[in-house]
Amino acid sequence: MDSNLVNTEDTLVSVIKDVTTDFRGAMCIDSFSVEALLQAIEVYPGRPIINSISLEEYAPGVDKIDAVVAPTCKHDPVYIALATGPKGPAITAIEKADLAKQIYEKCHSKYGIRANQIIVDVNAFPIGSESDDDMNFAMESIKSIPLIKKVHPDLKVSMGVGNLTNGLA
């Protein structure tokens, strides 16, 4: 939840309090603001799912893993990890698996995050938006799944299938 119209930190906390009054399911907490995520996690009554972490730069010299995982890992959350690095989103299956490995290794070695706490989002791009005729974004995303499971069998994988057809209608 991010907006130029409201104070994200206050609004996200308010929404979580209101929604979780009668709701005990899992909730994915999403914000570009690390401060908003921290405040939201403090009031969330369950185990949060945090969207998202990656190896892309959050601030000069700080990637999103360090910015988000360091202050939130004490809450034992599940993290959605985007297959995105300093150069942007991974395109090929091998690039996606390589970034998943780097993300897992950094999260595990530096913060003690277990593989079953990470859901790798393979960043599915729309079919037909490839600039290279030999590239198939959908197949690259699908082919990345077993490669990511080879990194660690407990890593989970997600793919926004709605993204595959975005813009085709």
Give short role names for the model-derived ranges.
Residues 1-25, 124-134:
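Glycine-rich, proline-tolerant flexible connector loops at the mouths of alpha/beta enzymes
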Residues 23-30, 50-56, 146, 151-161:
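Short, acidic/small-residue loops that bind anionic groups at enzyme active sites
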Residues 8-16, 37-44, 68, 95-96:
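Distinct, well-ordered alpha-helical segments
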Residues 24, 42-49, 73-79:
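Glycine-enriched alpha-helix->loop->beta-strand junction motifs that scaffold or abut catalytic
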Residues 1-5, 25-33, 48-60, 115, ...:
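Catalytic beta/alpha-barrel core
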Residues 61-63, 72-169:
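Catalytic alpha/beta core domains of metabolic enzymes, predominantly
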Residues 1-6, 30-32, 51-53, 80-82, ...:
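Generic beta-strand/beta-sheet core signal
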